[in-house]
């Protein structure tokens, strides 16, 4: 794209403990800056340099017992951004309880989350965005959550979680459009993406179940449901209504292991102006991906891996206008320091 980004991240947590009570101070800073090409295709792109810095300080009172824990604090942050400066304040309250050792664990609370969008992060999320796109920070100011983790037996474990988010400036990908000729002429659909913003609420329900058949074989089933309620937009464009994953792992010996998995990405809506039926949105079918892989661990440092994706060669559109089909794979070498 011709855009270069430099980034720096810092995080430091400090605990001052006196017996079962204490004070915790979480600090973090994220900085990213972009250098952009000048005068490149001005009729299509409007490049602008961007500097964004987010400074976070989260003070909290904590109490830790043998079976229960409590945290009461705030999340405070200041953002200095070429797009807009912001100050964020959200609660940071949580509690947990160990009902039975190795059997049942409960947790819940109210917190918030700041979600800055760097140039690299957006490109990784959607590789087909317009190269001149800068995306604002999303703020999930209030997030209620509750969860349970447990074991039915030594071979089975599960996790269930529910969360309700109230957010501001969440982004949704839509196809960028432009006009042929003068403004007011027919709108032309482009194959690059930009974003629309909206405030709203989201219900998130997730679960995970793991079963170990033997020392060599286990399976994992997990899924998440998303329920969007937006203030202005009709749909949460390109956001799935669910994600489901299933994976089987088999360890042949200490060095060689295999896996097989199926991933499901639920249906999504794409905003497409000018459809013949008068609508401005189209439904994208669910994505099914069956994959296989293997890993060979040569020693404690070196490993080799390979995987095949979309083994059944299904045709789908993760992003509107970009059909994917056919088998694809990758091989690689890993080294641990």
Enumerate the predicted regions with their spans.
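Flexible loop and strand-edge segments within Gram-negative outer membrane beta-barrel domains
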Residues: 1-7, 36
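Solvent-exposed loop and beta-edge segments used for protein-protein assembly and interaction
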Residues: 4, 17-19, 51, 64, ...
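One face of beta-strands
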Residues: 8-14, 21-27, 55-59, 91, ...
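Beta-strand elements of well-folded, non-transmembrane domains
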Residues: 14-20, 31, 63-65, 97-99, ...
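Surface-exposed extracellular loop regions of Gram-negative outer-membrane beta-barrel proteins
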Residues: 24-32, 37, 48-80, 214-225
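Flexible coil/linker segments and helix-coil junctions enriched in charged and small residues
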Residues: 39-44
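Short, contiguous, pocket-lining structural segments
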Residues: 47-53, 85, 201
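Exposed, low-structure sequence patches enriched in small/polar residues
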Residues: 69-337
């Amino acid at each position: 794209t011709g855009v270069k980004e430099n980034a720096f991240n810092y995080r430091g947590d400090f605990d001052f403990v006196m017996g079962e009570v204490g004070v915790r101070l979480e600090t973090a800073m994220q900085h990213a800056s972009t250098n952009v090409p000048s005068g490149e295709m001005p009729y299509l792109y409007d490049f602008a340099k961007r500097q964004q810095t987010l400074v976070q300080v989260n003070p909290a009172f904590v109490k830790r017992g043998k079976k229960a824990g409590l945290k009461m604090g705030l999340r405070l942050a200041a953002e200095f951004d070429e797009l807009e400066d912001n100050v964020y304040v959200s609660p940071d309250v949580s509690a947990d309880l160990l009902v039975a050792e190795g059997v049942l664990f409960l947790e819940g609370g109210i917190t918030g989350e700041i979600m800055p969008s760097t140039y690299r992060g957006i490109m990784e999320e959607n590789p087909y965005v317009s190269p001149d796109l800068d995306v604002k920070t999303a703020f999930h100011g209030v997030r209620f959550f509750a969860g349970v983790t447990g074991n039915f037996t030594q071979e089975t474990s599960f996790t269930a979680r529910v969360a309700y988010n109230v957010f501001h400036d969440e982004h949704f990908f839509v196809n960028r459009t432009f006009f042929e000729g003068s403004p007011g002429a027919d709108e032309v659909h482009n194959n690059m993406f930009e974003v629309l913003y909206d405030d709203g609420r989201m219900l998130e329900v997730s679960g995970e179940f793991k079963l170990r058949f033997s020392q060599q074989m286990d399976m994992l089933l997990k899924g998440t449901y998303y329920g969007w309620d937006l203030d202005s937009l009709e749909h949460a464009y390109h956001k799935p209504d669910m994600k489901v994953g299933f994976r089987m792992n088999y360890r042949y010996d200490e060095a060689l292991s295999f896996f097989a998995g199926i991933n499901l990405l639920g249906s999504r809506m794409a905003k497409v102006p000018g459809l013949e039926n008068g609508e401005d949105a189209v439904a994208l079918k669910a994505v099914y991906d069956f994959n296989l892989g293997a890993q060979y661990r040569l020693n404690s440092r070196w490993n080799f891996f390979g995987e095949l994706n979309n083994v059944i060669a299904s045709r789908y559109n993760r992003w509107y206008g970009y059909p994917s089909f056919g088998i694809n794979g990758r091989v690689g070498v890993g080294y641990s320091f």
